[in-house]
Amino acid sequence: MIIRNWTLLLFIISLISISSALIAEYFFNLQPCELCLKQRHPYYLILVSLVFIFIIKNLNKVVFYLLIQLAAVYGLFYSIWHVGVENKILKGPSGCSVMLKNSESASDLKAQILSKQVISCDEVIWSFFGISAASINTLVLLVIFILNAIYLFKNYGTKKEKNV
């Protein structure tokens, strides 16, 4: 049942995921870090791919499902990295901390600090029952990766023999 309606389910999962992130940012003022922003990219690519799949008939859809698979791998890379950074296991990218230039005065230093709004990647800004958003995203992308692989294999993995 899940695999039969996979395209619609994937669209709903992706739409909820990206909508949740945007609502958290713009309505609840939970500013994303650099890794959070990179974890949104797969959902945008998945949604665009699904629009092509839904709209264009006689399209080689396997290419788009493979693109979705690559998007899931990309997202898993960044979400696993983010979970590692949050748990102080891995080091975050340089954009996740404030880089200040040498200043000649305290007022210049203060101006630099106040002009930069940098959200640290190692701080959990939101969690659900103790599970960070990056961890939830890892699980969602893992489900997408596994179910999309099953869908690809069932629909495109083996040649179906026709009765002659």
Residues of each region from the PLM?
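Extracytosolic (periplasmic/ER-lumenal) interhelical loops and adjacent juxtamembrane/interface segments
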Residues: 87-132
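Membrane-embedded alpha-helical transmembrane segments of multi-pass integral membrane proteins
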Residues: 13, 17-20, 46-49, 71-81, ...
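Non-cytosolic membrane-interface motifs at loop->transmembrane helix junctions
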Residues: 30-41, 94-97
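Interfacial segments of alpha-helical transmembrane regions
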Residues: 2-12, 52, 56-76, 146
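Membrane-interface loop-to-helix entry segments
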Residues: 35-45, 110, 129-143
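A hydrophobic membrane-anchoring alpha-helix module
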Residues: 115-164
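C-terminal TM-helix exit segments that contain a strictly Trp-centered aromatic cap at the helix terminus
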Residues: 20-25, 74-89, 107
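Iron-sulfur (Fe-S) cluster-binding segments and ferredoxin-like electron-carrier domains
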Residues: 37-52, 102-104
